[in-house]
Amino acid sequence: MDKLLVLTQLADLLNRQKLRWAVGGSLMLYLRGVVSDFEDIDLFVTLEDAQQVIELLDQVAIPQETVPSEQFQTVVYKKYLMDGVFIDVMAGLRLL
C-alpha cells in the first residue's frame, strides 16, 4: 500500500481519538521536501497518550519485534507493520 495512504489512515485514527502525535525521521524530511522518499513512519506520541495509541495500533496493525538500544532509552518504543508500511511508535524519547 502507498506509504502516504497509510499515514493518512493513521492520522485519521489518532485524530478521531484526539491523541497528540507528530512524525519524525525520514518522513518529516520528506514532508518538508528535503528528501525524495521515506522508509517508514516514525510516530512520536506523548507519554500520556502512549497506551491508547498502542491499543489502537494493536487492532489495526501487526506488532513487530523490537530490539533494545543502549544509545536510546526511550520510555515507550513499539514497532508495527500496517499494510506493508513499518511504523515506529515512540514516547518519552531519551538519548544517552
What are the roles of these predicted feature ranges?
Residues V53-V60:
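Short amphipathic alpha-helices in soluble, non-transmembrane regions
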Residues R20-R32:
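Short helix-loop-helix/strand-helix junction enriched in hydrophobic and basic residues
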Residues L31-V53:
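Catalytic metal-binding acidic patch
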Residues L7-A11, I54, Y77:
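Short amphipathic alpha-helical segments and helix-helix/interface helices
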Residues A61-L96:
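Conserved catalytic core of two-metal-ion nucleotidyltransferases
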Residues M1-A22, D49:
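Helical scaffold of the NTase/Pol beta-like nucleotidyltransferase catalytic core
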Residues L27, D49, L93-L95:
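Short, flexible active-site-adjacent loop segments at beta-strand->alpha-helix junctions, enriched
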